[in-house]
């Protein structure tokens, strides 16, 4: 399993509520509206995580990370991820996607990463949570 992570910053002239509303009800559905079936081929999960800066318990400071949302997509294989990235560059859909992103994102130049996850045992029984598959 491979996870793609994208760090997103909203446009300065929209509120966080406007950002969330548009992302959830418009942008996240764009591929489907444009006729892609499925909208994210071979994706296993697609999640948006909206950021609320909190106080650092060591310093007491609230430090904004510079991004408003972390988008994550899980893929079974690197090949699935790469095929999806190639598909996103399809000229038939690229211009519409870029125009839609300009409605909510500060830039189209958002950092895109893949991550390798390791889980540690937690909780009273000191176990790795059951939803975690072994690495």
Show the residue positions of the predicted features:
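Macromolecular interaction modules
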Residues: 1-135
């Amino acid at each position: 399993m491979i996870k793609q992570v994208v760090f997103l910053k909203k446009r300065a002239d929209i509120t966080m509520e406007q950002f969330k509303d548009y992302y959830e009800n418009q942008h996240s559905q764009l591929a489907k509206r444009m006729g892609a079936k499925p909208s994210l081929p071979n994706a296993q999960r697609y999640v948006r995580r909206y950021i609320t800066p909190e106080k650092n318990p060591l310093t007491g400071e609230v430090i904004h990370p510079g991004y408003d949302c972390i988008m994550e997509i899980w893929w079974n294989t690197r090949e699935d991820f790469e095929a999806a990235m190639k598909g996103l560059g399809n000229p038939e859909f690229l211009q519409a996607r870029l125009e839609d992103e300009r409605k909510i994102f500060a830039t189209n130049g958002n950092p895109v990463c893949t991550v390798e996850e390791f889980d540690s045992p937690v909780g009273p029984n000191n176990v790795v949570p059951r939803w975690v598959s072994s690495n």
